[in-house]
Amino acid sequence: CLVLAPKNAWDEVRKFGGDHNYVMFNRRTLFSYGDITFYSVRAQHSDLEAVGVIISAEGKNYYITGDTLYNDEIFADINRDIDVIFVPINGVGNNMNIKDAALFAKKTGAKTAVPVHWGMFDSIDPNGFDFENKVIPEVYKEIVF
């Protein structure tokens, strides 16, 4: 089992032991696993070591922002074209709100955006996420890109 985690989380998850590959995955770390590459990018969160991840596989780049606020400094870490971005929209707990998330997704140049972190601590309707090519996830339904 592969476990990628920034330093503070890495220190904790290693305590679980087991036959796992625990990789310290701090900002701007690149890690390849077979034909898949993982690249960590800055996230703006209360946890200063928080990161997002760009996963590259089968010729596509998927950017999972993780918990983050909109911060222009993040864009300096995005060093490849983004096919799909997964972005929080709930505006709670240092996550972007729906408006900022749409602006952020557009600025990355992503072809498709998937709003996440809605319906947790809020009553946000993800259909209000202003992005031309968006995919609204449904519970227990696979998304194919």
Where do the protein language model's features map onto the residues?
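Active-site HxH/HxHxD metal-binding segment of metal-dependent hydrolases
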Residues: C1-F31
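Core dinuclear metal-dependent hydrolase active-site scaffold
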Residues: V23-R80, G93, V139-F145
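Active-site-proximal segments of metal-dependent phosphoesterases and phosphodiesterases across multiple
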Residues: D47, V84-K106
